Swiss-Prot record:
It is found in: Cytoplasm. One of its GO terms (molecular function) is tyrosine-tRNA ligase activity. L-tyrosine binds at Y35, Y170, Q174. Its EC number is 6.1.1.1. It comes from Streptomyces griseus subsp. griseus (strain JCM 4626 / CBS 651.72 / NBRC 13350 / KCC S-0626 / ISP 5235). The lineage of its organism: Bacteria, Bacillati, Actinomycetota, Actinomycetes, Kitasatosporales. Residues 353-419 form the S4 RNA-binding domain. PROSITE patterns: AA_TRNA_LIGASE_I, S4. This is Tyrosine--tRNA ligase. The keyword Cell membrane does not apply. Catalyzes the attachment of tyrosine to tRNA(Tyr) in a two-step reaction: tyrosine is first activated by ATP to form Tyr-AMP and then transferred to the acceptor end of tRNA(Tyr).
Length: 423
């Protein structure tokens, strides 16, 4: 079996650790309990969280025991962002988000067997602690000069807004999490992103002060980046969420399908569970025929299956093919079709007019004369059927599920018309 540290390094998942040799020894000596934390700062995890969630899954498959922490306490504070203070959410909202995040994380882990996963909430050990107890038992062991060196804190101190004592104290809470999990579960490894390094080591320092002789470790993964310099995890419409109500499975699939050729091989190593041989073959295909997007399809299919399930992934693939003329649109169920069409330009009309008007309405043609030219050149399609007369209105019987028409100009330009109340 491949050494898990070597595997993480090969996949680009190893940014740094506190003591690599000591970590390797701990992993070789026996089962290691580790944890990774997720703060409920929104109603859903987003694709940026997949690095940590899937790394937890990878570590569990290698024999480690995971503790998945959802921060009912830290979520009420918020890790300092480099730019501005977070908006505080009320405790009831955070409690609801804790449950939603638990439900998203649990399917990725195994809760049976010798290294069964455990879900934990840091509100369990902070809720009953008074401010005096926190300052005496935890705050006493932190040094402000060291806390000030954390990147996000330093940047905020240089800004006009500065940083509140609330957010400045966040690293004390995260440090206490590691201490409590060490005491309660024998947790000796914390996993997180490299931007969390200061918080990871804060917990180690606290344990060393209060538990002399304890051997504990931190492991940081690199931040996901994009070759074009834009922020990873954002589409044109905003963040890409794991919740299907916030980002449809179709949009989720398309996000990965549209990954830049310069990024796709790296993303596959980081996020996929395919073997080295399979990944090497996909890298080769990308070099030889990038236009086929084989690597992107493999990435999109695997991650959509992991997040939304195989049945939903199959429906999304069928919709993706059908929209571009490689399948029967009429075979798509209404929910899948509606979700897919929500991601393309569309217009709502009270009744169907001539096709040339519809092409202009949805933006597939700049004018009626442009629409007529598209039809004349054989480039206009309604529900994947080529149109020969643009002056005729589509028949109501052509409406998919009684409400949709899919219009296409050429091979790739899609739009939709929905018949219904306007306004």
């Amino acid at each position: 079996m491949t050494d898990i540290v070597d595997e993480l390094k090969w996949r680009g998942l190893f940014a740094q650790s506190t003591d690599e040799d000591a970590l390797r020894k701990a992993l070789a000596d026996g089962p290691v309990t580790f944890y990774c934390g997720f703060d409920p700062t929104a109603a859903s995890l987003h694709v940026g969280h997949l690095v940590q969630v899937l790394t937890m899954r990878r570590l569990q498959q290698a024999g480690l025991k995971p503790l998945a922490l959802v921060g009912g306490a830290t979520g009420q504070i918020g890790d300092p962002r480099p730019t501005a203070e977070r908006t505080l959410n009320d405790p009831e909202t955070i409690a609801a988000w804790v449950q939603r995040l638990r439900g998203q994380i649990e399917p990725f882990l195994t809760f049976e067997g010798p290294n069964a996963a455990t879900m934990v909430n840091n509100l369990d050990w902070t809720a009953g602690m008074s401010a005096i107890e926190f300052l005496r038992d935890i705050g006493k062991h932190f040094r402000v000069n060291k806390m000030l060196t954390k990147d996000s804190v330093a940047r905020r101190l240089e800004s006009q807004e500065g940083i509140s004592y609330t957010e400045f104290s966040y690293q004390l809470l995260q440090g206490m999490d590691f201490l409590e999990l060490y005491r309660r579960h024998g947790c000796t490894l914390q996993q997180g992103g490299s931007d969390q390094w200061g918080n990871l080591t804060a917990g180690i320092d606290l344990i060393h002060r209060l538990e002399p002789g304890a051997v504990v470790h931190a492991l940081a993964t690199p931040l996901m980046t994009k070759a074009d310099g834009t922020k990873f995890g954002k589409s044109e419409s905003g963040a890409v969420w794991l919740d299907p109500e916030m980002t449809t499975p179709y949009a989720f699939y398309q996000f990965w399908l549209n990954v830049d050729d310069r990024d796709v091989s790296r993303y596959l190593r980081i996020l996929s569970f395919k073997s080295r041989e399979e990944l090497a073959e996909l890298e080769k295909l990308t070099e030889e025929r990038p236009q086929a997007r084989n690597a992107q399809r493999a990435l999109a299919e695997e991650l959509t299956t992991l997040v939304h399930g195989g049945e939903q992934c199959a429906a999304v693939i069928a919709a993706s093919k059908a929209l571009f003329g490689q399948g029967d649109l009429a075979e798509l169920d209404e929910a899948t079709l509606s979700a897919a069409l929500s991601e393309v330009p569309h217009a709502t009309v009270a009744e169907l007019g001539p096709l040339v008007d519809l092409l202009v309405e949805v933006g597939l043609a700049p004018s009626k004369s442009g629409a007529r030219r598209t039809v004349k050149e054989g480039g206009a399609y309604v529900n994947n059927v080529k149109v020969v007369d643009g002056e005729v209105a589509p028949d109501a019987g052509e409406l998919l599920h009684g409400r949709w028409l899919v219009l296409r100009r050429g091979k790739k330009n899609l739009a939709a018309v929905e018949v219904g109340p306007v306004g």
